[in-house]
Amino acid sequence: MTSSPTVNLLDLDAAGLVAYCDSLGEKPFRAKQLQRWIHQYNAADFDGMTDLAKSLREKLKGRASITMPPVVSDHISSDGTRKWLVDVGNGNAVETVYIPEETRGTLCVSSQAGCAVNCRFCSTGKQGFSRNLGTGEIIGQLRMAEFALRASRGTAGGRATGGDGKGERVVTNVVMMGMGEPLLNYDAVVPAMRLMLDDNAYGLSRRRVTLSTSGVVPMMDRLGADLPVALAVSLHAPNDALRDELVPLNKKYPLRELMAACQRYLKVAPRDFITFEYCMLDGVNDSEAHARELLAVTRDVPCKFNLIPFNPFPESGLLRSKSEQIKRFAQVLMDAGVVTTVRKTRGDDIDAACGQLAGAVKDRTRLAERTGKGKVIEVRAV
């Protein structure tokens, strides 16, 4: 007779924990206790969960675990941006990036090892697609970052609830903008986001969790029905011909379908606008004519634009738009009354800037050889 495999409790959202506790003959309130210990107190084992009955702790020891993927490296940029490289097995690694600002701290979370969308300007796509991350590997990035950041500030004790003192939350916003297309890993991403929003876990509001998609139209509709959070759309081109080239997914879901999906999503969204992300590529999509075309294609969608200076990498064959051209492009949009921001490049000295999350593609295929599997490398400032 073989024993059942242990259940990683990080893979379970609130409903999953209730069902698991029920399978052990336990009441639903035990699930809330477990969830708080795991996500608010950073418990690594069951012995310290002192408000659980000893009999339940003994059951859990033999049947469950709280398993985090190991951190391979931890780097801090000169601008305070912090990047972790996380080993997700079989030579694959994903990256998690924390961006500190004066009034908030934003965590950029990965959803896949690699990416199948293969946008021309994104280094992650050049490494190819390996696999979807599990719910525990996704929410584990937030858990790891929150408590690592609190430890570095000397506030490791207490609950991460956003209150005063030692329980003050460091990560105030999460953006699903790391490696991968979140809507192509829907069944793992949504439970992870439910935990982000759960008051017994991280307690973020729907306005503070943003999912970025390249435009998987059917799953945008499903997300709107299941868990509408703030939405960003990787647009990057004002017409189908150019977007087909830059974002191959456009061939399946062209701009007219994408704009209609955005309109439907806004009926249930926590914000009253869609954020359109637009990577500024020199001589490709950055003319004033492109800007006017962009206004036309998005005219029926309440929106704001986030212009992203391209972060060059060798395989792309692309260049960043010149600063003056970005300003001219932005001015066309602003003159039309559309809120437009230019993303400040953060963490590019540690390859943590937008579009750089794969690092050197060849390095990802030799993760174990480079670092030793599971080894944690000391933080270094750069």
Curated annotation (Swiss-Prot):
Cofactor: [4Fe-4S] cluster
Enzyme Commission number(s) of this protein: 2.1.1.192
InterPro entries named among the record's database cross-references: Aldolase_TIM, Methyltransferase_A, RlmN_N, RNA_MTrfase_RlmN, rRNA_lsu_MTrfase_RlmN/Cfr, rSAM
Active site: 95 (proton acceptor), 354 (s-methylcysteine intermediate)
EC top class named in words: transferase
UniProt binding sites for [4Fe-4S] cluster: 115, 119, 122
Residues that coordinate or bind S-adenosyl-L-methionine: 180-181, 212, 234-236, 311
Signal peptide: none
Keyword vocabulary terms for this entry: 4Fe-4S, Cytoplasm, Disulfide bond, Iron, Iron-sulfur, Metal-binding, Methyltransferase, rRNA processing, S-adenosyl-L-methionine, Transferase, tRNA processing
Disulfide bond residue pairs: 108-354
Biological processes per GO annotation: rRNA base methylation; tRNA methylation
Entry annotated with the keyword Disulfide bond: yes
GO MF: 4 iron, 4 sulfur cluster binding; metal ion binding; rRNA (adenine(2503)-C2-)-methyltransferase activity; rRNA binding; tRNA (adenine(37)-C2)-methyltransferase activity; tRNA binding
Chemical reaction(s) catalysed: adenosine(2503) in 23S rRNA + 2 reduced [2Fe-2S]-[ferredoxin] + 2 S-adenosyl-L-methionine = 2-methyladenosine(2503) in 23S rRNA + 5'-deoxyadenosine + L-methionine + 2 oxidized [2Fe-2S]-[ferredoxin] + S-adenosyl-L-homocysteine; adenosine(37) in tRNA + 2 reduced [2Fe-2S]-[ferredoxin] + 2 S-adenosyl-L-methionine = 2-methyladenosine(37) in tRNA + 5'-deoxyadenosine + L-methionine + 2 oxidized [2Fe-2S]-[ferredoxin] + S-adenosyl-L-homocysteine
Note in the entry: Reaction proceeds by a ping-pong mechanism involving intermediate methylation of a conserved cysteine residue.
Sequence similarity: Belongs to the radical SAM superfamily. RlmN family.
Function: Specifically methylates position 2 of adenine 2503 in 23S rRNA and position 2 of adenine 37 in tRNAs. m2A2503 modification seems to play a crucial role in the proofreading step occurring at the peptidyl transferase center and thus would serve to optimize ribosomal fidelity.
Record protein name field: Dual-specificity RNA methyltransferase RlmN
